[in-house]
From Swiss-Prot:
Protein name: PX domain-containing protein EREX
Description of how the protein assembles with itself and partners: Interacts (via PX domain) with RABF2A and RABF2B.
Keyword annotations of the record: Coiled coil, Cytoplasm, Endosome, Lipid-binding, Membrane, Protein transport, Transport
PROSITE patterns, A to Z: PX
Source organism: Arabidopsis thaliana
SMART domains per record: PX (SM00312)
Gene3D superfamilies cross-referenced by the UniProt entry: Phox-like domain
Region (Disordered): 36-85, 252-273
Top-level taxon in the UniProt lineage: Eukaryota
GO function term, MF aspect, one: phosphatidylinositol binding
Coiled coil: 420-585
Observed effect of gene inactivation: No visible phenotype under normal growth conditions, but the double mutant plants erex and erel1 exhibit severe growth retardation at a juvenile stage.
Membrane topology category: Peripheral membrane protein
GO biological process, one term: protein transport
Length: 755
């Protein structure tokens, strides 16, 4: 969101503000350059100013396709300004920046110093850093403004930019350290780090054009301050203008006129040289600041004063003489036969108006509040024989206007028509000189900018080396201090160790004394021990004799043990032979055990298969029994001995009986197949299974007998139906039930056929 899109100021509406900055802010380029397309050219932000477009060829219409660059006309900041690297030294209005100022408005940021200011009357003073925002116009005029910011403000700016530009890799902000003592060196280091961080941050074009930066640096206030300074200086320099200009201001609102007498041209050309030099200096001083905006304006004024095209001293005398003669009378139109020829100035709206004259003395008494020399106009020829200006040249409208006038842009310089050819020749010569001087000046400026850039780079490197040297010096100093502290700690530790060693020496001396006492006691004890040793030696001799006796007895026992060992070896051999026989018997028994386990498992499997077969047989018998029950045909026996079927016709009843016979035949065939499967199972299982096989056989026979009986019953019913011994029930209210039974029979039959 652009904070400056709808924040219009007094400068935007051009409310009675004169000077080059009085134009609407949409005209960003106030001087002719490669992007200036004429007098009526408006600065449009979305226009792509490529190199071809600046030279008259068709510019690139797709401005969004090209990457953004400095002064490309897309900056949303006030006046479309862009960040630039700061100059080496700020030298006021004529500061030289390391770039071409004609490209557009620029701003730079430096942190020159800091100041201690109290937040309130009670609190302690806090450190505020002076942030200097310098602005340079396309004319090369520099203005600066200071903004006070705390260190926390810089950190808040960093966090806000980090949130807005998430994908950008931002330079790290200076670390926040607690300054217990406000040392000048530490504050200076922090100031340098803040300035370097701001320049590295603003080197990104997107960040330098963001609203956060504009708000933090108060760029709009800086622009207003620039224009206020410009306006104040214009006011100061405009005090000498009324005495130099031959203009009169009428008391009638909305009208003005200039009347000039050229009765004696020869006298005009022989004016005082000193007066001309003074006027020339004043005019040059007046229009020096607008020379870059409109080049022809300053050249014409210099020509008028330098080459004597208009003698101002005689000019003022003629005006005074005319004013004393006419007084306050209104001036008429000038004719050829008149004694004096007057020149009327055409207003910008095209209407020729005549105004009363004021004397030069009244003009000098008038308070001059504003002055402007920016807009070029082309005056028309007024009456035959009047002085005019060549159609291709544009005059410079300038004048001194009081605080109550509204026609400050409606006046222009006029001169004699006889001097036109001389003026043209001089203008052409000066134009050539001016172009050559401009080319040389641009070359020198480019070289100077290169030298300044190199010097600035070298100064930056030197400053970085100084900062690095200072940091190294501080680190070395801190290291030495730390080393000294460590050595002091080690010295104190050694002193404590020496004290401990002294204590240990005293303890060792006391311990040695005690050892000496013990040694004397031990010597006395040793004497007693020697006597005891002699007694022990005698006892040892006695024990040795006993040992020899025991050794002899042991040898005898060993001989006996060897004999017994031989006997035991023989017994072990016999046991080993018996052990091999037992192992063979054990292996045979294990084989028999495995065989029995296989047989038992086989029997278990056979019983399991038999159980499954029995379950399957019972299930199939149940299924066959149900299917046999489905083959029944419903009959009702009445008292007269007639059978009544639930059928709508006789043919349908016969069809049902035939279907039932077919199904019963299929059931008999399936039962026979089941009995054959039972026989096969009996053969595969081997031998007789006893009662289970008999039960299976009986079940199959019972099913077959029932099926045959049903088939015989159906044949009997068919015969009786063919003899018309059975009556058919009329279809009535039970039609739905009969249709359901027929559908059920058909469904069962289809299932049987599918099987």
């Amino acid at each position: 969101m652009n904070l400056y899109a709808h924040d219009l100021s007094l400068l935007d509406f051009n409310y009675n503000v004169s000077g080059p900055f009085g134009e609407p802010l949409s005209h960003r380029f106030l001087s002719p350059g490669p992007f200036f397309q004429g007098e009526e050219d408006d600065y449009r932000r979305n226009t792509s100013y490529s190199h071809d477009g600046a030279n008259g060829r068709e510019p690139d219409t797709d401005s969004r396709a090209s990457p953004p660059h400095r002064h490309d006309g897309r900056s949303p900041l006030p006046l479309g300004m862009d960040w630039s690297s700061p100059p080496r030294h700020l030298e006021g209005r004529d500061t030289v920046w390391p770039h071409d100022h004609r490209t557009g408005w620029s701003y730079c940021v430096t942190v020159p110093s800091w100041v201690d200011l109290p937040k309130s009357s009670v609190s302690d003073p806090a450190v505020f850093y002076r942030v200097q925002v310098a602005i340079q116009s396309p004319e090369g005029i520099t203005s600066a403004r200071l903004v006070l910011r705390r260190f926390n403000d810089f950190l808040e700016l960093y966090s806000s930019i980090k949130k807005e530009f998430v994908k950008k890799s931002l330079p790290q902000a200076p670390p926040k350290k607690i300054l217990r003592m406000r040392n000048q060196t530490l504050l200076e280091e922090r100031r340098c780090s803040l300035e370097d961080w701001m320049n590295r941050l603003l080197s990104d074009i997107d960040i330098s054009r963001s609203a956060l930066i504009a708000t933090f640096l108060e760029l709009e206030a800086a622009v207003r301050s620039y224009f206020n300074d410009e306006y104040q200086e214009t006011e100061d320099t405009s005090g000498d203008i009324p005495s130099l200009l031959p203009t009169t201001i009428s008391d009638v609102p909305g009208s003005s006129s200039v009347t000039i007498d050229h009765d004696n041209d020869s006298a005009d050309e022989t004016s005082n040289a000193s007066t001309m030099k003074h006027d020339e200096a004043n005019l040059k001083n007046l229009f020096s600041r607008n020379s870059t905006a409109v080049d022809n304006v300053t050249d014409w004024h210099e020509l008028i004063t330098e080459y004597g095209l208009l003698d101002q001293s005689s000019f003022q005398e003629k005006v005074e003489r005319l004013s004393s003669t006419n007084g306050d009378a209104a001036t008429g139109t000038v004719t050829r036969g008149g004694i004096s020829s007057g020149v009327g100035i055409q207003r910008l709206d095209g209407s020729d108006r005549k105004f009363q004259e004021l004397t030069i003395e009244s003009i000098k008494k008038t308070h001059v509040s504003d002055f402007e020399a920016s807009t070029a106009v082309e005056p028309d020829l007024v009456n035959q024989g009047a002085m005019d200006i060549h159609g291709e040249a544009h005059g410079n409208m300038y004048g001194a206007v009081g605080g109550d006038t509204e026609t400050q842009k409606d006046l222009a310089i006029v001169f004699q028509s006889e001097e036109r050819h001389k003026l043209k020749r001089v203008i052409d010569t000066l134009k050539q000189r001016l172009e050559t001087a401009k080319a040389d000046t641009e070359d020198l400026i480019s070289r100077l900018n290169q030298e300044l850039a190199v010097r600035q780079f070298l100064s930056t490197k030197v400053r970085d080396l100084e900062v690095e040297l200072e940091t190294t010096r501080e680190s070395c100093k801190q290291g030495m201090e730390k080393t000294v502290l460590d050595e002091k700690e080690r010295f104190t530790q050694i002193q404590w160790d020496m004290e401990e060693l002294r204590k240990q020496c005293m303890e060792m001396e006391s311990f040695l004394n005690s050892i000496k006492d013990e040694k004397t006691h031990i010597e006395t004890a040793n004497e007693s021990l020697v006597q005891e040793n002699q007694m022990l030696l005698q006892q040892i001799n006695d024990i040795r004799e006993n040992f020899e006796n025991f050794h002899k007895e042991h040898e005898e026992l060993e001989v006996k043990a060897k004999a017994e060992l031989k006997v035991l070896v023989k017994e072990v051999k016999s046991l080993r032979t018996t052990q091999s026989d037992l192992r063979q018997e054990l292996s045979g028994i294990m084989k028999e055990k495995l065989e029995m386990e296989r047989i038992v498992q086989r029997e278990k499997d056979r019983e399991e298969t038999a159980k499954n077969a029995d379950k399957k047989l019972l299930h199939e018998c149940d299924v066959l029994q149900n299917r046999l029950q489905e083959c029944n045909v419903k009959f009702d026996i009445e008292e007269e001995g007639k059978l009544i079927m639930d059928s709508s016709s006789l043919s349908e009843a016969i069809e049902l009986l035939a279907t039932s016979d077919n199904r019963i035949g299929l059931l008999i065939a399936e039962t026979q197949l089941l009995s054959e499967e039972v026989e096969k199972l009996k053969l595969t299982s081997g031998g007789h299974r006893g009662t289970d096989d008999l039960v299976r056989k009986m079940l199959t026979e019972v099913l077959i007998d029932n099926a045959r009986l049903r088939k015989q019953v159906n044949s009997v019913l068919r015969c009786s139906l063919s003899g018309h011994g059975i009556s058919v029930r009329e279809a009535g209210t039970e039609v739905d039930d009969e249709e359901g039974s027929i559908d059920l029979a058909r469904t069962v039959m289809s299932k049987i056929l599918e099987k």
